[in-house]
């Protein structure tokens, strides 16, 4: 696909991959060398501390666990990414603190509480991106039979921040007793 963009469209493409697992990075770099992708680089590290670029056109995350998704989304906003495609994973942060007595029929059951926390987290993430000038959608990107973690947050930069979206996240956060990392990162 990268070659098609370069050859057919004339785009100057550079792709950077980050992962915390050394063996994954080594394998990806071996593939890069084998197939001659000179503008494709993989680095071992955390996106929160990555300083290799000032701006990007697109950020893609796949199953960045818990708050790693938040750090990636915040970095994408900071870099001014035109497009963000994010497949979140295990949203433990909200699950640890979420509470609301009126929702006890859900909160009293671990699996339901976990799923509710995941939905609330991803909804808040989408709204926070809207508050920073992105048009967002949450889509099912692959059939449930392949993975239960099949939601994709798609965000396209419009440059029109939505203050109401931020208020909605504030209200939900207060009601459910959650304080999401992405909200804090975007406030800095």
Walk through the language-model features, giving the residues of each.
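Short helix-capping segments at alpha-helix termini
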Residues: 5-10, 34-37
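Conserved small/polar residues in nucleotide/adenosyl-binding loops
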Residues: 1
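Short beta-strand element of Class I
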Residues: 10-18
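Class I S-adenosyl-L-methionine
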Residues: 18-188
């Amino acid at each position: 696909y990268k070659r098609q963009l370069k050859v057919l469209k004339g785009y100057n493409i550079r792709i950077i991959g980050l992962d915390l697992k050394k063996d994954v990075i080594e394998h990806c770099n071996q593939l890069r060398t084998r197939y001659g992708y000179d503008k494709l680089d993989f680095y071992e590290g955390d996106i929160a501390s990555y300083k290799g670029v000032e701006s990007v056109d697109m950020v893609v995350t796949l199953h960045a666990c818990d708050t790693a998704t938040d750090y990636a989304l915040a970095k994408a906003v900071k870099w001014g990414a035109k497009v963000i495609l994010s497949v979140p994973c295990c949203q433990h942060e909200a699950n640890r603190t979420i509470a609301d007595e009126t929702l006890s029929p859900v909160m009293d059951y671990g699996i339901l509480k976990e799923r509710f926390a995941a939905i609330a987290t991803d909804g808040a993430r989408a709204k926070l991106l809207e508050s920073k000038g992105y048009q967002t959608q949450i889509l099912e990107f692959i059939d449930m039979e392949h993975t239960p973690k099949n939601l994709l947050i798609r965000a396209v930069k419009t440059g029109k921040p939505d203050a109401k979206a931020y208020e909605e996240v504030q209200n939900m956060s207060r009601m459910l007793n959650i304080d999401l990392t992405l909200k804090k990162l975007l406030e800095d």
